[in-house]
Amino acid sequence: MLKLLLPMIMLLPTSWLCKKNHLSYTTLLFSFTIALLSLQWLKPPFELTTTFSNTYMGVDPISTPLLILTSWMTPLMILVSKNHLIQEPLSRKRTFTTTIISLQISLTLAFSALEMMLFFTMFEATLIPTLIIITRWGNQMERLSAGTYFLFYTLIGSLPLLIALTSLHTNYNTLSLFILQLNPPNLTNSWAHTMWWFALLMAFMIKMPLYGLHLWLPKAHVEAPIAGSMILAGVLLKLGGYGIIRVTLMLNPLTKSLSYPFMTLSLWGIIMTGLICLRQTDLKSLIAYSSVGLMGLVISAALLQTPLSITGAIILMIAHGLSSSMLFCLANTNYERTHNRTLLLTHSMQTLLPLMTIWWLLASLMNMALPPTINLMGELTIIASLFSWANITIILTGLGTLISALYSLHMFSTTQWGGTPPHHMHTITPSHTREHLIMMLHMVPLILLMMKPQLMTTF
């Protein structure tokens, strides 16, 4: 663990000490090296033990895929922000790189934490760099409103979580995940224990986000720069799912009786957000709402607590992290040229950027879970486990899958086809090799994981 954590920490002084002309290349090279080194965490499917670094940190089959995803996204964020920062002075470029690296360190510590208070601290620490990225480097004035939404939604859920953890430590004298899973708290259906259950899970529900608590997400995505959208869609939403999977293991038998409203709301949210996506005019907002629907599937799978559902949740989180991040990158390539996110004003891109159409097609097919993608593996696994829990869920999940196919095809056809391009788009610059490299680095892991999905399974 430390042989990867220390190089991450050393990237902070490196970004301030390296020469002006070498800043982007140095940080990019080192972060790619860390991303490749993180692959050593992968283990054969029959070796499902926890690797301890110390009593507070460790790596197991649930956290490993998310840790590797975090390490993989950092160099992509640095690479995709190159054009966004081209007009910025050197000190701001260094500050931006430092913010991204500190976010990577916080996420790595959160995913590898085996002690609840360390996990809570790092869970909250990710808020500060993300808020700085949204409010300082966002494109519109509304970024301040988006930052306020993001801050207050997250903090409202975090205070009950802190109180619940303090209460847990007072009663059991430990916050170690392993001890609490082996010797779980003796919970009853009393009001106190019910409120404690809600307090422990509410912060993660908001982070996912659960339908009804999701209003901060479209605002944050739309106003954030491309690096902010990538880390939000790619990793930060998964922090909520990871927290639910970890915490629910010690909340039995209350979860079986109290999870019904949340599972119903998350499954209903798949249909509602899908219908919202069909009526969206803003491209980034469409991708953000599609994330809410897919994360609803993950919430219901995590609360179901069967080995099959948790495996499906992890597969879908990894698949969504890469595919939605790729969609945001593609939306950014259009925005950098047209300075517009409206679907009707940026149509017929195929005639202007023909190579980008291939990436748009692949990303849309991944997002709609076409066979044999890992998105389909994750969705099918979750749908099967939900069907075995309650047969009626097949109506909601089936409708949700149909609507997601509709809005994915609508997004692709609107952006790529539609007659003659508008006049304001006739003189846009062609696509760069850097942009194709970014898309390839998103797509290659998705294709390779199709060949060996056992790397993400937990049983």
Swiss-Prot record:
Q: How does it sit in the membrane?
A: Multi-pass membrane protein
* InterPro entries given in the database record: NADH4_N (IPR000260), NADH_Q_OxRdtase_chainM/4 (IPR010227), NADH_UbQ_OxRdtase (IPR003918), ND/Mrp_TM (IPR001750)
Compartments where located: Mitochondrion membrane
- Domain of life, per UniProt, equals Eukaryota
Q: Name one GO cellular component term.
A: mitochondrial membrane
Which GO terms are recorded in the biological process aspect for this UniProt protein?
ATP synthesis coupled electron transport; electron transport coupled proton transport
The protein's name: NADH-ubiquinone oxidoreductase chain 4
Primary gene name = MT-ND4
